[in-house]
Amino acid sequence: MTALPQRTLMVMAGGTGGHVFPGLAVAHLMQAWGWKVVWLGNPAGMEATLVPKHGIPMEYVRFGGLRGKGMKTKLMLPVNLLRACTQSLSVLRRVKPDVVLGMGGYITFPAGLMTALSGRPLVLHEQNSIAGLANKVLAKVAKRVLVAFPNALPHGEWTGNPIREELARAIAPKARYAQRSGPLNVLVVGGSLGAAALNEVVPRAVALLAPNERPRIVHQAGAKHIEALRENYSAAGLQAGADVELVPFIDDMTSAYANADLVICRSGAMTVSEISAVGVAAFFVPFPYAVDDHQTTNAAFLADNGAALVVQQRDLSAETLADWLRSQTRETLAEMAERSRSLAKPDATEQVAQICATVAGSISGASPEGKQ
């Protein structure tokens, strides 16, 4: 019997982890199904360093955004866009992908346009609750439009965000919370850049609580901010120890989420999706300068369903947080966690991969050997 030719997926994604990591989740699954995967990114983006470490070959297109740039960059847009389109077309002719998956980042725009104009099928995935201009345009020429949050794009199919497999396999919240006793376990996530508002307010809020009201804290703040965070806790009369753990990084986020009764954090798209997948109560403080304020609408997806609380940074204070923590019990947080888990899309990675396979003309992609 003649073996079927190996099919090729090209992933277009770059710029931030919110675009790259969900793309990697789909890429690895497609590889497990026997597909060849090629990644199109920007040589100056994080993907240029990260993706090759995952054994995925790279192709490059140079293209950047206009937000915050000077007049010279804006005047050069037509030239830069034309160059990026030419580079994208060259890559498409060389790679000959059976399907192209656009996961976001500036390079997705010229490469997505050239994908559609060259007659190759484009699958578009929007990770945020509010789509950017590029995806709004590309959605008009894509074969399938997928969204992580309902109604992010017209006619978008709600798949959720592709996440790491271990997050989707976390033990159900009801079982986790029922096994615990004693002080609440609170995880504070500032991210690699640190979230100054959280680093300043959380220590003061905990200090306002009576000793018997204080939760156990695991506070992640990024390597550059860990000493300042230590000083913040010290100034609040709290020392790092058994009940206050300060860490620059967390390698195993699945365990960190699963061990927490409550997560206090920003509300980037992947953070919201991961918290929902694991099923844990959340206190969101959206980044106030996010494009189109998309972090607020990301968080609202869970908050509107009783799975989280959203407090804007301008309204956040030690007193507000302390009062809210006093009002919570492990039982109330467990209820929030259950609601959060019920909104998750744990099969998002497989669903996105299956759609790519279908668009490429496969009967079924769900085969580790890639047999159709």
UniProtKB/Swiss-Prot annotation:
Please provide an example of a Pfam family that matches this protein in its UniProt record: Glyco_tran_28_C
Biological process per Gene Ontology, one example term = peptidoglycan biosynthetic process
Q: Which domain of life is it from?
A: Bacteria
List the catalysed reactions.
di-trans,octa-cis-undecaprenyl diphospho-N-acetyl-alpha-D-muramoyl-L-alanyl-D-glutamyl-meso-2,6-diaminopimeloyl-D-alanyl-D-alanine + UDP-N-acetyl-alpha-D-glucosamine = di-trans,octa-cis-undecaprenyl diphospho-[N-acetyl-alpha-D-glucosaminyl-(1->4)]-N-acetyl-alpha-D-muramoyl-L-alanyl-D-glutamyl-meso-2,6-diaminopimeloyl-D-alanyl-D-alanine + UDP + H(+)
Q: Keywords of this protein's UniProt record, alphabetized?
A: Cell cycle, Cell division, Cell inner membrane, Cell membrane, Cell shape, Cell wall biogenesis/degradation, Glycosyltransferase, Membrane, Peptidoglycan synthesis, Transferase
Q: How does it sit in the membrane?
A: Peripheral membrane protein
Positions bound to UDP-N-acetyl-alpha-D-glucosamine: T16, G17, G18, N128, R164, S192, I250, Q295
What EC identifiers does the entry list?
A: 2.4.1.227
Record GO terms (molecular function): UDP-N-acetyl-D-glucosamine:N-acetylmuramoyl-L-alanyl-D-glutamyl-meso-2,6-diaminopimelyl-D-alanyl-D-alanine-diphosphoundecaprenol 4-beta-N-acetylglucosaminlytransferase activity; undecaprenyldiphospho-muramoylpentapeptide beta-N-acetylglucosaminyltransferase activity
Any idea where this protein resides? Cell inner membrane
* Pathway(s) annotated for this protein in UniProt: Cell wall biogenesis; peptidoglycan biosynthesis
* Primary site of residence: membrane
Give the UniProt entry's GO cellular component terms. plasma membrane
The entry's family comment says: Belongs to the glycosyltransferase 28 family. MurG subfamily.
PANTHER family of this UniProt entry? GLYCOSYLTRANSFERASE (PTHR21015:SF22), UDP-N-ACETYLGLUCOSAMINE--N-ACETYLMURAMYL-(PENTAPEPTIDE) PYROPHOSPHORYL-UNDECAPRENOL N-ACETYLGLUCOSAMINE TRANSFERASE 1 (PTHR21015)
Its job: Cell wall formation. Catalyzes the transfer of a GlcNAc subunit on undecaprenyl-pyrophosphoryl-MurNAc-pentapeptide (lipid intermediate I) to form undecaprenyl-pyrophosphoryl-MurNAc-(pentapeptide)GlcNAc (lipid intermediate II).
Protein name per UniProt: UDP-N-acetylglucosamine--N-acetylmuramyl-(pentapeptide) pyrophosphoryl-undecaprenol N-acetylglucosamine transferase
Natural source organism: Paraburkholderia phytofirmans (strain DSM 17436 / LMG 22146 / PsJN) (Burkholderia phytofirmans)
